[in-house]
Amino acid sequence: MKSPAPSRPQKMALIPACIFLCFAALSVQAEETSVTPQPPDILLGPLFNDVQNAKLFPDQKTFADAVPNSDPLMILADYRMQQNQSGFDLRHFVNVNFTLPKEGEKYVPPEGQSLREHIDGLWPVLTRSTENTEKWDSLLPLPEPYVVPGGRFREVYYWDSYFTMLGLAESGHWDKVADMVANFAHEIDTYGHIPNGNRSYYLSRSQPPFFALMVELLAQHEGDAALKQYLPQMQKEYAYWMDGVENLQAGQQEKRVVKLQDGTLLNRYWDDRDTPRPESWVEDIATAKSNPNRPATEIYRDLRSAAASGWDFSSRWMDNPQQLNTLRTTSIVPVDLNSLMFKMEKILARASKAAGDNAMANQYETLANARQKGIEKYLWNDQQGWYADYDLKSHKVRNQLTAAALFPLYVNAAAKDRASKMATATKTHLLQPGGLNTTSVKSGQQWDAPNGWAPLQWVATEGLQNYGQNEVAMDISWHFLTNVQHTYDREKKLVEKYDVSTTGTGGGGGEYPLQDGFGWTNGVTLKMLDLICPKEQPCDNVPATRPLSESTTQPVKQKEAEPTP
């Protein structure tokens, strides 16, 4: 006797399953064809631990980036022979056996530059090339030049780069945009995903998935050819984020995938390792030791996963905002990540259609629609009136409002009535004289009050504009630009983060001194300058008085989600 034909809901469930099984093979194939470079804590074992614990360098990243002058196994053998000998000098041993990273030259801009001129002049200063690296270097080679954030950093970072690329495009450097997309595609083909940054010690995690948005940006210049060219890499990245989904039962999690009790599929941040981060070794060990009630490996994994989120660190991940050792990133389903996954699915549908595969496009649309329903069901706090993260331990949406709540608006996944409530919540709780607060909590962590970060300012601005909430959107842009301009007027630089409780002050907190440069601030500043000033009268500095522009009255016409029932 024939089995009954599957019902419509069963058919809908079969479509994503097919996609996940097909793409799991892509992820495995990418991993099998590459030899993963070992991070320095594995290559050097006890020597790495001893050097970092000795605090030979003010910044723990210094030794993580040091290049062994010979085979690490030989260096380690020499160390074991010499370390207990009388008069052994660890610093001298390191200086003899390693090439330490050079301090970046401090950039002194020409006098009298406008804000726009300063940013345009920085692009070549921040550009690096690493087609070839030393054999045991933690730096991973990339085929094309790339733009680093600036300051402390010698490598390219994943999610930073999207906002940097917005500025490159605004400056007309489409060649650099294309180079950076090609580099990230190379990483996907080589490692199966885009690591946090191009360092061996970042390979165990990724960052907020903006690659599909980068390809979409490039398509503004190159048309559908860009979408078709990078469709395979977008599919591989999607496979990475959904790896393990085909074996999940309801209520289970596997790496970056979460399957809730009703079968809803969402994602979380995850790092494959559960050891201290090489670039913050001593700090991570101290954090783990400060909470003996939790396994150290669990704390290490959650610290690493918070780094994967880009929000390292924030009260958003903690039970107690004043105690970093209470963070539990892996038991939280983030609203921003799932918004980006929704956007990835939508762009994959568009790219599949451009490539002539309508059946595959429909499957991605099905996945996007299912995720959108999941966002509305699990990542909306109806009592508070804003989007928020979901807690896997309490099985409830969290109460905290953060700037991540604007991501559903940014990717056009929000219901129209909820977007209106988000505008009210943003203006009431997050908008400050110097821009948008990251959260309203003062924890001393850098992704909390009073700090404001350029990418979140842009996500909020564009997200609110997508739903016609132009007044609040323009308030955010104007407040943040004023902050950037005041800081530039005083210090002649753009910085990584800003204190938004006032104007003209760089932000605090974090694991390293405030950085200048700064890639994503440069990009967002250029976008906002063009937003507040009329096209016929572009401004090179932030005007002394707020101009009226078409943007303040005309909403950006985007497709909106239907109101929630």
UniProtKB/Swiss-Prot annotation:
Pfam families: Trehalase (PF01204)
InterPro entries on file: 6-hairpin_glycosidase_sf (IPR008928), 6hp_glycosidase-like_sf (IPR012341), Glyco_hydro_37 (IPR001661), Glyco_hydro_37_CS (IPR018232), Trehalase_periplasmic (IPR023720)
Region annotation (Disordered) ranges: 539-565
GO molecular function: alpha,alpha-trehalase activity
Compartment(s) where it occurs, according to its Swiss-Prot or TrEMBL record: Periplasm
GO biological process: cellular hyperosmotic response; trehalose catabolic process
Superkingdom, taxonomy of origin: Bacteria
Gene3D superfamilies: 1.50.10.10
Catalytic activity: alpha,alpha-trehalose + H2O = alpha-D-glucose + beta-D-glucose
GO CC term, one of those recorded: periplasmic space
Keyword Hydrolase tagged: yes
List of residues binding substrate: R152, W159, D160, N196, R205, S206, Q207, R277, P278, E279, G310, E511
Keywords: Glycosidase, Hydrolase, Periplasm, Signal
Extent of the signal sequence: 1-30
Record EC number: 3.2.1.28
Active site annotation, chain numbering: D312, E496
Main subcellular localisation: periplasm
Function: Provides the cells with the ability to utilize trehalose at high osmolarity by splitting it into glucose molecules that can subsequently be taken up by the phosphotransferase-mediated uptake system.
Similarity comment text for this entry: Belongs to the glycosyl hydrolase 37 family.
Record-linked NCBIfam families: PRK13270.1, PRK13271.1
Subunit structure: Monomer.
Protein name: Periplasmic trehalase
The encoding gene: treA
